[in-house]
Amino acid sequence: MKIVFFCPPVSVINGGIKHIFRMAEALIAQGCEAVVFEQNGQRPVWFASTAPIVGQGIFSADADHLYVLPEDQPRILSDFARLPQRKVIYSQNHFYGALGIAEAADYSAYGVTDILCSSRTIYDHCRLRHPGLRAYVVPCAVDPAQFRPAAEKRNVIAFMPRKRAIEAAYIRDMFRFIYPQYRDWAWMEIAEVGEIEAAHRMGEAKVFLSLSRLEGFGLTPLEAMASGCVVAGFTGIGGREYATQDNGFWVSEDDFPAVLTALVQGVELNLAAGAALEKYHNACHKTLSSFTPEAFRKGVKDAWDIILSNK
C-alpha cells in the first residue's frame, strides 16, 4: 500500500507543509511506501526533503493507496470522499478545521477513519468534535541541528509578522516610543525566507517577539527557544501547551500593553545575563525535550502501526 500525502503548493512557506514531508520521510525510514502529492509535482526549495514527489494523474479508484488529507479544504475532502480508498486527516490546526468540515456532521462523512493531530490541543478538540474517529498525537519537532544559537548574539529582536502584521507594526512603534533607551536594538523581520535563513536570523537574535495567532500548536516560539532567544509575546492559544512562566514572557491574546512589558523584560533579562538568563535557557531546554525529532518519529510509528493494522 502506498501512503499518499496531499500537500498544498510548496511555493507557500508554511510550517505545516514541512511536517507533511517530515512524516512521509519518517514512514519511508520505517519501511512504508509514502509519497507527497503536490499539484505541480514540485519539490520545495525553502527546506530540504528526500520524500518522493508525485503530481497529477496518481489518483484512481482502483489504486492501492491510503490518502492523508488536510483538515481545512472542503473541496478536496468532498472530491476524495468519492474514492473508495481509506482516508486519514492530518490536522495541524483545529481552528482552520472548521473551514474544512463545511456542512458535514464530522469528518467521517468524507470517509475519514483516523485523525493525526500535531498537538495535544488538537487531539483534545478532535476527541470532542469527532468522537467516532480514532485520533493520535504526533508531536511537532524542532531540529536542534538547524535551530541553535549563533556563536555571537546581537542586540536584535526577531519577529515573524505573517499572522499579525498590523500588531507587529504597532508593537514596534510603541516599544521605541515607551522605551527610547532601547532604540539601538535592531528589529529583524523573518518573512518569506527558507528554513536555513530563518534559523540563521533567530540564531543571531537575543529576543523573539511571538506573534502567534489561532495556532493549533505554534512551533516558531519553540524554534526561537532552541535558537537561544528569550521569547516574549502571544501563545496563539495552541502555544499554551508548552508556555510556562519559566520559558517565556507570555501574555494574553491581544493584550498590547502587556506585550510591551513582556518585550522589555526579555531585553533586560538578556542585558542582566548571569544566573537568571541561564535559568531561563535551562527551562527552554526542558520544554524542548518533549519536541525532538525522535519524539516525532516515535509518534509517527505509534500512530501508523495502529492505522495500518485497522482495515
Predicted regions and their residues:
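Conserved catalytic-core segment of nucleotide-activated headgroup transferases in glycan assembly
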Residues: 16-19, 124-195
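Short alpha-helical segment that forms part of, or immediately flanks, the ligand-binding pocket
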Residues: 199, 222-226, 240-241
